[in-house]
C-alpha cells in the first residue's frame, strides 16, 4: 500500500485542549452560534455576511483584518451579522499549489501537518478571543472535523466536495450552519441532494466507528457560479437563477430555506472587483421580489487588506490564492449594504 504513516495517531481530544475557549470567549462563541441558527431559520432577519480572505496564510495579517472587521461589525450589527472566513485548507484543481495553513504553517516553508493543526487552532482561537467574531472554514477533510469543530460557527462544503457522500453524511452530524456550494458543473440538483442528505439522519463509519447522526436542519445553499467544459464561466446570481434555486427548496422538501450568494469564484470569474456589482444586483433583486428577499439572505465575499492577489507572500495582507477585495473597498461595500437594507 502506497500510504505511509508519518506520525503517531493524533488524539482529537488532546488537540482540542490546545487553545481551547474558556470564559468570555466561550460565551461569545455560544451566543454567536445561537444567533446564526436564528438567522438560518428566519427568526432573525439580519443579513448574513461570510467574509474574509480566500486563504488565511499569515497570522498577523489575518488578525489585523479581523480587528478591523470586528470594529465595523459593531457599527452595522443592527442589520448585518458577520462571520469571518478563516479558511485554512484549500482545495486545488490538480493537487498542486498552496494548500492552506494546515499544510504549510509557513506559506513558503515545508509541509508540516502536525504543526499546521496547531497553527490553525492558534489562529482561530485568537480571532475569537481577541475580537469575538464567529468564524467559518471549509470542511475540506471530514476526518479533521474533530480537531476544530469547537472553534467553528460555520462550515462550508466546497464545489469539489458537494457530491461526496462522506462530506454529506458528516455534515448531517454538525450542529452549526453548513453551506453547500453548487458543484463546478452548476448542477443545482447535486447541491440540493447534498443538502437533503445533510438535513437527515445518516448511519456510516467515521473515525473507525459506526456512527449515527441527528441531521443538520441548518444545512443550506451557496450559489458560486459554474464552469463549462470549455472553461467558460456560467454565473448563477441573476434574478432567474435565484428563483430557480429557491424553487428547489420546495421541490426537495427541505427545512429552513436559505441561500447565500458567493460573489467571487465563477460568479465573478475571479475578477475580484466584480463582487461589488454582484452584491448590488442581488440587493436590487431582493427589493424587487419578496420571495427572494425572504430566502436569499446573505453573501460570501472574498476580502483581505489589499486588492488582488500575488504569487508569493511579499505584500502584507494580499492574497496568495484567489484575488480579494482590499479593505477600503470592503469597508465601503459593507456600509453600502447596510444603508440599502
Predicted stretch roles:
Residues 1-41:
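N- or domain-start disorder-to-order transition segments that initiate the globular core
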